[in-house]
Amino acid sequence: LARKHSLSAVSAICILAFATQSGAAAPEPQAVIRHYADMALAKYEDALTTAKALDAAVDALIAAPSQETLDAARSAWKASRIPYQQSEVYRFGNPVVDAWEGRVNAWPLDEGLIDYVDPAYGTESDSNPYYVADVIANPSATINGETLDMSELTPDSIAGLQEAGEVEANVATGYHAIEFLLWGQDLNGTGPGAGNRPYTDYDPANCTHGNCDRRAAYLKAATDLLVADLEEMVANWQPGGAAESVVMGDPKVGLRAALTGMGSLSYGELAGERMKLGLILHDPEEEHDCFSDNTHASHLNDAVGIASAYTGRYTRVDGTQMTGPSISDLVAAKDPALDTEMRGKLDVTLAAMNAMAARAEGGEAYDQMIGEGNEAGNAAVQAAIDGLIDQTRSIERVVAAVDLGQVEIEGSDSLDNPDAVFE
């Protein structure tokens, strides 16, 4: 198996690795992938449902700005992250999902592209000519000879800003752009506290920081666009849809995609880019949900999604339990000891993630945990990283056990070549 280098709303979690009886007849691989695709559809439907609730909460905030309506919109954003993060396991190994993902979950972002920033942010960047474009304050701007017309802030116009100038940090759409517009910058470093944007940033009658009408228009455009993007992915997982067709044509291809998703999210993306990099640098800018201090929940729900892809179990936002033929069932029929090992590793990771989340819910946010000198916090994060790395080794063994040939799992310099992080 090859590795390549690359780059409070915590769902109620119980241990997902339920016992599988040894010696049970193996399910048909096609049935396993059918259930895997059905769970994908359910997760994206749930992400869409909660995004629509977020959109409604944003409407209420804009219609009647207050601390209450701002808090409600923030809570709706956190709730929307739960099913979406559990869907991230479908990204790697499925090019349809991977090509779409950057529109909804790209990070980190240079927030000066969108709105006002603290003076400490600076006024220029060698790598980003749009670093302080502030399109909310500037309906028109000329950058590198190109005129940027943002007189109308609509889903189409902000979609055109995404990765402006081919700079990945120009994130204009998706969950994290919305997060910034609801919380504002987190100026606390590795100290306590999240972003603290006032509700008056959306109140034309008592406007703070100017341009309250345009800020509201941008927020509304971003939430409308998120709903539209999720509707697209729901359609892609319907029978015959583009993403569903990737996995359903050949069961072996589907199983490779499923295990690539589990391994790449476990190792390169979550353990590496989202966790170990920030821990090495002790840098809150490397925190996934950096404005809201919701990172612990996002990481936990990623881990839940990985376990779900293996066990075939998913709890929908309405409480419905989905179960069906699973990769775990396939492995148990071939190698019961390996299935027990795999489920045990998933349990260890979930326990570490839950411990980290409990620490955050108890008052020490993730950006504080990764702070330099916080030995206990660093250790809590490292325990979750270790669990993810360890479960990836078992995923590699599962690939061999079900005879899938070569599967590429994303790597990360943070894990494979830490010195390169400082170059």
Label every model-predicted segment.
Residues 25-423:
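Mature extracytoplasmic or organellar-lumen-exposed domains after removal of signal/transit peptides
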Residues 10-17:
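Bacterial N-terminal signal peptides
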Residues 19-22:
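N-terminal signal peptide c-region/cleavage motif recognized by signal peptidases
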Residues 1-10:
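Bacterial N-terminal signal peptides that target proteins for export
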